[in-house]
Amino acid sequence: MALTVKAAPSGVYGLGVLKTRLDLDRIHAARRVIDPIFLSTPMYRCDALGRQLGCTVSIKLETANPVRSFKARGTELVASLLTEQGRTAVVCASAGNLGQALSWSGRRRGLNVMVVAPRRAPAAKLDRIRALAAELELVDGDFEMARERAASIAQWRGVQLVEDSLDVETCEGAATIGLELAGEESTFDTVLIALGGGAMATGVGYVLKTLVPGVEVICVQPIGAPAMTRSWHERRVITTESTDTIADGVAGRYPIPAVLDDLLTVADDAVLVHESSIIAGIQMLLEHTGLVVEPSAALGVAAVLEDRDRFVGRHVVTVICGSNVDLDAYHRWVYR
């Protein structure tokens, strides 16, 4: 079964404003700033997948857009704010998806974008960053090393540093997914969200717990990159020395305290899943939905696979958050 412990206490829902950094009015306003190509993404029931998993399953598809992930919902807000402030350049650290999204949003608004990424990031993600005319610097080591380098460059060049999850705009952009879920006519009782730095989990969780508090928000993270999940259960920041997972998009080691505080308020549970279940999820999404996804997008399916009894009789929504995947690696996972 999925590795989990008794859920930590969550915020009091439906009785007042949740105490987080996020704001519902700003999230509603964000829809007027984000390019419509990233909004109102498909959500539909997948009966074939549901039969295999033993529950009703719907997917929220965040990959049918120019950057193949949900990240541009946040970078659209970031880039808009920076141009309003008269900024001309920006730098970020990224495992691939944020860098691609910021490059797209920045180019649209005339911002010079620099991305610092781990050298071992999937080649497909790095190639797409280059294709968007961003300056790309590769570093040895993991995402945390890239984050340190990006901060150093920002200070040295005097440009704005964009930090995913810490910059609340990245969370509030992702939160527009929650608005769309809350507006769906179909009834669902559980949402499974990939957990890395926490932008999507806190954003979507905040909206759901504000508007439809009965929906259970479950965050899912690989057992090989457990820092945020362990922090959620311990209710304090827990760091790790390394990560070991194919889900590079969620492989952080140093949770951000402010983001953890938000997550403690809006998430009902956080679970860890094994690599074998992530790979099985990738395979099932291809076979039963026709979707080619990156490992992070299969975490929700993996969570159901590891704890089937928990989800029997439920209507589960899993957010398909990205499809920027190295094809050689994908073929190894799917056809092994």
Q: Each predicted region: which residue ranges?
A:
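PLP-dependent amino-acid enzyme catalytic core
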Residues: A2-R336
